Amino acid sequence: MRKTNLQNPQLNLSDFQDKSLLILDDDDPLRGRLSRAMEKKGFIVKEAKSVADGLQIVKKSPPNFAVVDLRLEDGNGLDVIKELSKNKPESRIVMLTGYGNLPTAVAAVKAGAIDYIAKPADADDVEKALLADPNQKAAPPENPMSADRVKWEHIHLSLIHI
């Protein structure tokens, strides 16, 4: 599982007046566990298990934070990310995916996500990603010859050209 590695400390949830969080995932046990964990951390959680439900929540009351699965039974989580980014540009969105690869990461960021995390998602990693300071760049992995380093460099270069 990928962990967000920041050079400087993250923001605190108390820095945000709006603590609303949408968790969109069709995996009921994962969504339930993550929802409970994020509520304990202070987020006000709304759950959705389909693109249709997620879009309804985003249009009615756009959350400040969102954790969105990429592949859902009724469509693509990128549609929800795009709609939330349009309705609330300052929202902080993290994409969850069991299919972590470079094109997925780039598509998520282009749609408005600030990060992506491979499943199974750990609540601490999700919180770190949601609260990452937008003014700080993610540090590259420590092993300069690792596959993670190569992936990070490629993502970084790809994002420069967005």
What are these regions (language model features)?
Residues 160-162:
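Conserved small/polar residues in nucleotide/adenosyl-binding loops
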Residues 42-49, 57:
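Short hydrophobic/Thr-rich beta-strand motif most characteristic of the beta2 strand and flanking loop
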Residues 31, 73, 97, 101:
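The feature encodes the CheY-like receiver
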Residues 101-103, 120-130:
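C-terminal output helix
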Residues 50, 76-79:
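Acidic catalytic/metal-coordinating carboxylates
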